[in-house]
């Protein structure tokens, strides 16, 4: 009866100990049996940091680097943005491509970091400026590239923006600037900070000449950039979800000892509170900017605006 309470001991195939002794300890038995691990090439796929959707990198590029799952806008390089925006995908003329940053303060390791970014991005600085066509109209455009020193504004970045504005004035063209920056470049000290005043003064001259300036803020736009030229547009536009502000959320909360809203400093929060004119999806950006430029450059566009404007001259 007792033997009925217990099942029979199951038998398993065994490998003689002398056989195992002949197999080196470092041998992967699964590979010896013919099973091979498949390696995924680096950069083949990308995981959305917001919703976790997996994209093939090529599909993500075709979708203008926007997540198909949650519409999260990935950062774009300056060449990618120019290709997506301009009529021919390239600048008709690039300005000041040979301007290179020096190390005026002798900051340790600064030149080495610049050289590394130059090699990684194939750029000389954190912004590309030039003239191109948008919707058939000539424009002067600047695009910041966050791959280069987080697109921080140093003396060369400020100088290139100022010169681009001066070119817009000389050529009587609209000026469009895409911002993406961590702020002023600390390695250049006060030379970096004074670019805020210099670029703002140049935009004041552009305004006196009654020429259009459209500022497009992308993620992230912070510090001295948000406190100067990026907030001075005739139209201030941002991409969805872009983080825009001066100091970071944590610094502000620690200073005022209050909890901030969850959507604080997002493009949508700023639009709701009157600090932006539009939040425009990347797929609609080219069409939106084309319409704004057309409206402000053609006589037909001006007349259409005057007819629809509630502000009538007396």
From Swiss-Prot:
Cofactor note: Binds 1 zinc ion per subunit.
CoA carboxyltransferase N-terminal domain boundaries: 44-311
C4-type zinc finger span: 48-70
InterPro entries the UniProt entry points to: AcCoA_carboxyl_beta (IPR034733), Acetyl_CoA_COase_Trfase_b_su (IPR000438), ClpP/crotonase-like_dom_sf (IPR029045), COA_CT_N (IPR011762), Znf-ACC (IPR041010)
Gene3D superfamilies recorded: 2-enoyl-CoA Hydratase, Chain A, domain 1 (3.90.226.10)
One Pfam assignment: Carboxyl_trans
Main location: cytoplasm
Catalyzed reaction equations: N(6)-carboxybiotinyl-L-lysyl-[protein] + acetyl-CoA = N(6)-biotinyl-L-lysyl-[protein] + malonyl-CoA
Top-level EC class as recorded in UniProt: transferase
Binding positions for Zn(2+) per the UniProt entry: 48, 51, 67, 70
Keyword Secreted: no
Cofactor(s) listed: Zn(2+)
Recorded GO CC terms: acetyl-CoA carboxylase complex
EC number annotated for this UniProt entry: 2.1.3.15
GO molecular-function term, one example from the UniProt record: ATP binding
GO biological process terms, semicolon-separated: fatty acid biosynthetic process; malonyl-CoA biosynthetic process
Keywords recorded for this protein, A-Z: ATP-binding, Cytoplasm, Fatty acid biosynthesis, Fatty acid metabolism, Lipid biosynthesis, Lipid metabolism, Metal-binding, Nucleotide-binding, Transferase, Zinc, Zinc-finger
Recorded metabolic or biological pathway in which this protein acts: Lipid metabolism; malonyl-CoA biosynthesis; malonyl-CoA from acetyl-CoA: step 1/1
Localization in the cell: Cytoplasm
Domain of life: Bacteria
Family: Belongs to the AccD/PCCB family.
Function comment: Component of the acetyl coenzyme A carboxylase (ACC) complex. Biotin carboxylase (BC) catalyzes the carboxylation of biotin on its carrier protein (BCCP) and then the CO(2) group is transferred by the transcarboxylase to acetyl-CoA to form malonyl-CoA.
Subunit structure: Acetyl-CoA carboxylase is a heterohexamer composed of biotin carboxyl carrier protein (AccB), biotin carboxylase (AccC) and two subunits each of ACCase subunit alpha (AccA) and ACCase subunit beta (AccD).
The protein's name in its UniProt record: Acetyl-coenzyme A carboxylase carboxyl transferase subunit beta
């Amino acid at each position: 009866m007792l033997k009925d309470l217990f099942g029979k001991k199951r038998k398993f195939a065994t490998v003689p100990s002398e056989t195992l002794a002949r197999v080196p300890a470092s041998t992967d038995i699964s590979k010896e049996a013919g099973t091979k691990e498949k390696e995924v090439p680096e950069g083949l796929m990308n995981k959305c940091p917001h919703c976790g959707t997996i994209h093939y990198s090529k599909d993500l590029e075709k979708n203008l680097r926007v997540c198909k799952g949650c519409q999260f806008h990935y950062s774009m390089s300056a060449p990618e943005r120019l290709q997506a925006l301009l009529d021919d995908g390239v600048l008709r003329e690039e300005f000041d491509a040979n301007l290179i940053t020096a190390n005026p303060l002798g900051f340790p390791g600064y030149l080495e970091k610049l050289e590394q970014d130059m090699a990684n991005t194939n750029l000389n600085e954190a912004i590309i400026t030039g003239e191109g066509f948008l919707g058939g109209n000539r424009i002067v455009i600047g695009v910041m590239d966050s791959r280069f020193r987080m697109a921080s504004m140093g003396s060369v970045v400020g100088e290139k923006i100022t010169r681009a504005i001066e070119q817009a004035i000389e050529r009587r063209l609209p000026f469009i600037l895409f911002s993406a920056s961590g702020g002023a470049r600390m390695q250049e000290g006060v030379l970096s900070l004074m670019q805020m005043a210099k670029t703002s003064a140049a935009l004041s001259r552009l305004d006196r000449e009654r020429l259009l300036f459209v500022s497009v803020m992308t993620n992230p736009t912070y510090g001295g950039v948000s406190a100067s030229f990026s907030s001075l547009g005739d139209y201030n536009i941002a991409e969805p979800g872009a983080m825009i502000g001066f100091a970071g959320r944590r610094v502000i909360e620690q200073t005022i000892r209050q909890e901030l809203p969850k959507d604080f400093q997002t493009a949508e929060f700023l639009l709701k509170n009157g600090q932006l004119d539009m939040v425009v999806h990347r797929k609609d950006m080219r069409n939106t900017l084309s319409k704004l430029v057309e409206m402000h450059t053609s006589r037909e566009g001006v007349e259409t605006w005057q007819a629809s404007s509630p502000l009538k001259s007396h």
